[in-house]
UniProtKB/Swiss-Prot annotation:
GO BP annotation list: translation
Organism (species): Bordetella avium (strain 197N)
GO MF, any single term: rRNA binding
Claim: RNA-binding is one of the keywords in the record: yes
Pfam families for this protein: Ribosomal_S8
Protein's recorded name: Small ribosomal subunit protein uS8
Superkingdom classification of source: Bacteria
Lineage: Bacteria, Pseudomonadati, Pseudomonadota, Betaproteobacteria, Burkholderiales
Subunit: Part of the 30S ribosomal subunit. Contacts proteins S5 and S12.
Length: 131
């Protein structure tokens, strides 16, 4: 069966793995998922990630991060979805928890955080919120 929203599936796998204290989580890989994992690593929400498997069926393995026995990611939720795309201009990109969290935005210059998008003066599709 085909997956209608692979990004929501990625976020759900991360959320579920952290609820049962898993150290790693595996999922099918794509360029967009790798870009999101890169942003999560740069922002300190995950320890690392690695693309494994064959060229025909690559798999993304994410190593989750915990602090004092609790997951670093407290909240991770999908914003724009296939049935309702959410686009924001450069001046309307939302802040998550007054800047304590990040919104991951897909722009014409690549996938980046809300702060970086505002600094570069670009808007785009708001993929998810992470706090």
């Amino acid at each position: 069966m085909s997956m209608s929203d692979p990004i929501a599936d990625m976020l759900t796998r991360i959320r579920n793995a952290q609820q049962v204290d898993k150290t790693t989580v595996n999922m099918p890989s794509s360029k967009l998922k790798v870009a999101i994992a890169t942003v999560l690593k740069d922002e300190g929400y995950i320890d690392s990630f690695e693309v494994k498997g064959s060229q025909a069926k690559p798999e993304l393995e994410i190593t989750l991060k915990y602090y004092a026995g609790r997951p670093v990611i407290e909240r991770i939720e999908r914003v724009s979805r296939p049935g309702l795309r959410i686009y924001k201009g450069r001046s309307n990109i939302p802040q998550v928890m007054n800047g304590l969290g990040v919104a991951i935005v897909s722009t014409s210059r690549g996938v980046m955080t809300d702060r970086k998008a505002r600094a570069n003066g670009v808007g785009g599709e708001v993929l998810c919120y992470v706090a």
